[in-house]
Amino acid sequence: MSKTLQSFNLLKWIDENKELLKPPVNNKVIWQDSEFIAMILGGPNRRRDFHVDPSDEFFYQIKGECYVECITEEGKREVVTVKEGDVFMLPAMVPHSPHRVANTYGLVIERKRNQGELEDFVWFCDECNHEMHRVRVQLSDIEKQVKEAIHSFNSNKEIRACKNCGHIMPEEVEEWKCE
């Protein structure tokens, strides 16, 4: 969409663009020429990385539920359930892994990054929670770079092997289930 002074029906836009919402992330940026990254994310996504974003992230769950798994300051995993119609503001620098199940849609808004402002994608062992791998990027294309980071991790058995407990994370990610 171009920068125009015109509204549009977001649900219609989602319906017309849902074929673009593909795993592992299932995201599509709405406007390319904005100072914000406003994107629709659909489910099911297939990711297990934790994103450490230098800016706040605003979540609005349009359809179904989204589960945002966060790492607390104490290093514990905590899941925030964002129900249909709910909003959630995730503070900057909180490691988080958004999980979406089938037939769900949400809007996420974050700001574009300043030059030199870096962020991380981090993988933790499913068995012992040890940090296994970290990728630091200057984010310029969220649709492309997140997928590349996930693919790089999933395709490399050496970095999927936990150096702490020996557990090997599977290459293929199952649809996330809230426990």
From Swiss-Prot:
<comment type="function">
    <text>Catalyzes the oxidative ring opening of 3-hydroxyanthranilate to 2-amino-3-carboxymuconate semialdehyde, which spontaneously cyclizes to quinolinate.</text>
</comment>
<dbReference type="InterPro" id="IPR010329">
    <property type="entry name" value="3hydroanth_dOase"/>
</dbReference>
<dbReference type="GO" id="GO:0005737">
    <property type="term" value="C:cytoplasm"/>
</dbReference>
<keyword id="KW-0479">Metal-binding</keyword>
<feature type="binding site">
    <location>
        <position position="125"/>
    </location>
    <ligand>
        <name>Fe cation 2</name>
    </ligand>
</feature>
<keyword id="KW-0223">Dioxygenase</keyword>
<protein>
    <recommendedName>
        <fullName>3-hydroxyanthranilate 3,4-dioxygenase</fullName>
        <ecNumber>1.13.11.6</ecNumber>
    </recommendedName>
</protein>
<feature type="binding site">
    <location>
        <position position="100"/>
    </location>
    <ligand>
        <name>substrate</name>
    </ligand>
</feature>
<comment type="pathway">
    <text>Cofactor biosynthesis; NAD(+) biosynthesis; quinolinate from L-kynurenine: step 3/3.</text>
</comment>
<dbReference type="InterPro" id="IPR014710">
    <property type="entry name" value="RmlC-like_jellyroll"/>
</dbReference>
<dbReference type="InterPro" id="IPR011051">
    <property type="entry name" value="RmlC_Cupin_sf"/>
</dbReference>
<feature type="binding site">
    <location>
        <position position="51"/>
    </location>
    <ligand>
        <name>Fe cation 1</name>
    </ligand>
</feature>
<dbReference type="Pfam" id="PF06052">
    <property type="entry name" value="3-HAO"/>
</dbReference>
<feature type="binding site">
    <location>
        <position position="165"/>
    </location>
    <ligand>
        <name>Fe cation 2</name>
    </ligand>
</feature>
<dbReference type="GO" id="GO:0019805">
    <property type="term" value="P:quinolinate biosynthetic process"/>
</dbReference>
<feature type="binding site">
    <location>
        <position position="57"/>
    </location>
    <ligand>
        <name>substrate</name>
    </ligand>
</feature>
<dbReference type="GO" id="GO:0043420">
    <property type="term" value="P:anthranilate metabolic process"/>
</dbReference>
<dbReference type="GO" id="GO:0000334">
    <property type="term" value="F:3-hydroxyanthranilate 3,4-dioxygenase activity"/>
</dbReference>
<dbReference type="GO" id="GO:0009435">
    <property type="term" value="P:NAD biosynthetic process"/>
</dbReference>
<dbReference type="GO" id="GO:0008198">
    <property type="term" value="F:ferrous iron binding"/>
</dbReference>
<keyword id="KW-0662">Pyridine nucleotide biosynthesis</keyword>
<keyword id="KW-0560">Oxidoreductase</keyword>
<feature type="binding site">
    <location>
        <position position="57"/>
    </location>
    <ligand>
        <name>Fe cation 1</name>
    </ligand>
</feature>
<feature type="binding site">
    <location>
        <position position="162"/>
    </location>
    <ligand>
        <name>Fe cation 2</name>
    </ligand>
</feature>
<feature type="binding site">
    <location>
        <position position="96"/>
    </location>
    <ligand>
        <name>Fe cation 1</name>
    </ligand>
</feature>
<comment type="similarity">
    <text>Belongs to the 3-HAO family.</text>
</comment>
<dbReference type="GO" id="GO:0006569">
    <property type="term" value="P:L-tryptophan catabolic process"/>
</dbReference>
<feature type="binding site">
    <location>
        <position position="110"/>
    </location>
    <ligand>
        <name>substrate</name>
    </ligand>
</feature>
<feature type="binding site">
    <location>
        <position position="47"/>
    </location>
    <ligand>
        <name>O2</name>
    </ligand>
</feature>
<feature type="binding site">
    <location>
        <position position="128"/>
    </location>
    <ligand>
        <name>Fe cation 2</name>
    </ligand>
</feature>
<keyword id="KW-0408">Iron</keyword>
